[in-house]
């Protein structure tokens, strides 16, 4: 089972058991993740950078997908990861690598 399938299963279980929280969080994300003064692409890169530095695997899957869907290239994602490594040190390299693997799959 790949990372996206695992995340989908976990999200389904969360929605079934916490529908109110899920709905409110979804509304929040719908408000935040759209073009504004920052483009959706920029917001997804920021979210992925945060996901990598806080080591949230599900967030990494979600926002790597978001980056690709928003039009990010592998080069843009990789450059953002340079900042993650500069700010997060060695652990950021592990989680950045996970995101690169996912992005590589999605960009094929």
Q: Which residues make up each language-model segment?
A:
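Iron-sulfur (Fe-S) cluster-binding segments and ferredoxin-like electron-carrier domains
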Residues: 62-77, 103
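Short cysteine clusters
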Residues: 56-59
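Acidic, glycine/proline-rich low-complexity segments that act as flexible tails and inter-domain linkers
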Residues: 1-43, 94-108
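Immediate flanking context of iron-sulfur cluster ligation sites
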Residues: 37-54, 75-84
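Short basic/hydrophobic patches in alpha-helices and adjacent helix-turn junctions
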Residues: 52, 66-69, 86
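C-terminal structural segments of small proteins and small subunits
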Residues: 78-104
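Amphipathic alpha-helical segments within well-ordered protein domains
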Residues: 29-30, 47, 64-68, 81-82
């Amino acid at each position: 089972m790949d990372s996206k399938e695992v995340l989908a299963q976990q999200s389904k279980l969360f929605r079934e058991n916490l529908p109110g929280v899920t709905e409110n969080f979804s509304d929040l994300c719908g408000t935040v993740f759209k073009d504004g003064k920052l483009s959706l692409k920029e917001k997804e890169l920021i979210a992925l950078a945060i996901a990598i530095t806080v080591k949230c695997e599900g967030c990494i899957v979600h926002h790597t997908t978001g980056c690709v869907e928003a039009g990010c290239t592998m080069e843009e994602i990789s450059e953002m990861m340079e900042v993650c490594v500069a700010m997060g040190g060695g652990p950021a390299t592990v989680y950045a690598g996970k995101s690169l693997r996912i992005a590589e799959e999605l960009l094929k």
